[in-house]
Amino acid sequence: MASHEQALILEPAGELRFKGPFTDVVTADLKLSNPTDRRICFKVKTTAPKRYCVRPNSGILEPKTSIAVAVMLQPFNYDPNEKNKHKFMVQSMYAPDHVVESQELLWKDAPPESLMDTKLRCVFEMPDGSHQAPASDASRATDAGAHFSESALEDPTVASRKTETQSPKRVGAVGSAGEDVKKLQHELKKAQSEITSLKGENSQLKDEGIRLRKVAMTDTVSPTPLNPSPAPAAAVRAFPPVVYVVAAIILGLIIGKFLL
C-alpha cells in the first residue's frame, strides 16, 4: 500500500494496551512525533470504529513537534477467552507547501504511493495481570487485507453515558425533559388565552366602528334643518296676489251683471 517508510515516530510503536476493568471508558495514549523538517499530515484508522473514540483522529504535525492522541475504548463485556482482533493504523503523508484548505480532499486526492502507514495491535489487560492474548499468526497474516475505517470522533462524556453507572444522569435528563414539556404546555395555554382575549377586543372594536359609522351618517343627513314653518309662511306670502286677482275678477263680473 505504501512505498515509503513511516516518517512519524509512534510511541508505543507496535501495540496499544488497554487496562481493565472495561465497565467504563478505558484510554490508551499514543504519541506521534515528527522528526523531519517538513509538515506531515496524519490520520488514525481502526478496524472497529464503533468500539473506539479517537481524539484527534487527524491533523497536521509541524516539523520537530509531537502530539498526544487519546484512543478511548468504549465499555463492553470482557471475555478472556475471546481473542482480540482489533487493529489500528496510523496513516501519514507529507503535507503540501501551500495552505491546506480541506484535509478531507487532500486525503481523497492523495496518490497511494505517497502514503505511509503503521499498524498497531490492541491488547486488553485485566488488573490481576492476566491479559488477552494478541491476535494469532493467522490473523496477523490478514492484516494487509483488514478493513480500516476512521474512528468516530465522539466526545468522551457522550460515550461514557453508555455505561450503567451513568444511568442516574439519564433519569435526570428525562425528568428535565418532562419539566420542559410542562413549561411549554403552560406557555401554549397562556398564548391561547391571549389570542382569545385579542379576538374579543377585536370584535368590540369592530362593533364600535360600525356604531361610529352610523353616527357619522346620521350627522351627515341632519345638518339640513327640518323647519316646516318657513314654507307655509312663504306660501302665505305667495297666495294673497292670486286671491286678489280672483276676487277682482268675481267682483268685476258681479258689477258687470248689475250694469247690464
Curated annotation (Swiss-Prot):
Gene Ontology CC annotations of this record: endoplasmic reticulum membrane; neuron projection; plasma membrane; synapse
Pfam families according to UniProt: Motile_Sperm
Cytoplasmic-side positions: 1-238
TM segment ranges: 239-259
Domain (MSP): residue spans on this chain: 7-125
Membrane topology: Single-pass type IV membrane protein
Any Gene Ontology biological process: endoplasmic reticulum-plasma membrane tethering
Disulphides: none
InterPro entries, per the entry: Ig-like_fold, MSP_dom, PapD-like_sf, VAP
Coiled-coil region(s): 172-216
Annotated tissue distribution: Detected only in the central nervous system and the gill of aplysia.
Protein family per UniProt: Belongs to the VAMP-associated protein (VAP) (TC 9.B.17) family.
Protein name per its UniProtKB record: Vesicle-associated membrane protein/synaptobrevin-binding protein
Organism: Aplysia californica (California sea hare)
Upper taxonomic lineage: Eukaryota, Metazoa, Spiralia, Lophotrochozoa, Mollusca
